[in-house]
């Protein structure tokens, strides 16, 4: 590497790889917080059948923009409270009106 490339590499900030997940908002009752249900499919260890697994995450929603039924993308962040370590980054799909 030349001297110029070394200086540029040293000046560039370190890129942090954060996990991102996509899920459905199942609760928006708390202030600045939404509960997101993330579903995934996994193979059963003993029987080999593909089964649905799910987990709920509490995510930070600063302005209260996201409502029940919205599909959102969440990314991992620093701990914001006892149970909240995720932040909603974008809206993937708006909830359908029934």
Curated annotation (Swiss-Prot):
Which InterPro entries does this UniProt record tie to the protein? NA-bd_OB-fold, Ribosomal_uS17, Ribosomal_uS17_bact/chlr, Ribosomal_uS17_CS
Q: Which UniProt keywords apply?
A: Ribonucleoprotein, Ribosomal protein, RNA-binding, rRNA-binding
Q: Which GO terms describe its cellular component?
A: cytosolic small ribosomal subunit
| Organism domain of life | Bacteria
- Among its keywords, does the record have RNA-binding? yes
In terms of Pfam families, this protein maps to: Ribosomal_S17
Q: Which GO terms describe its biological process?
A: translation
Q: Where is the signal peptide?
A: none
GO MF entries = rRNA binding; structural constituent of ribosome
Annotated family = Belongs to the universal ribosomal protein uS17 family.
> How does this polypeptide assemble, per the annotation?
Part of the 30S ribosomal subunit.
Role description: One of the primary rRNA binding proteins, it binds specifically to the 5'-end of 16S ribosomal RNA.
What's the protein here called?
A: Small ribosomal subunit protein uS17
This chain's source organism reads Leptothrix cholodnii (strain ATCC 51168 / LMG 8142 / SP-6)
UniProt gene name: rpsQ
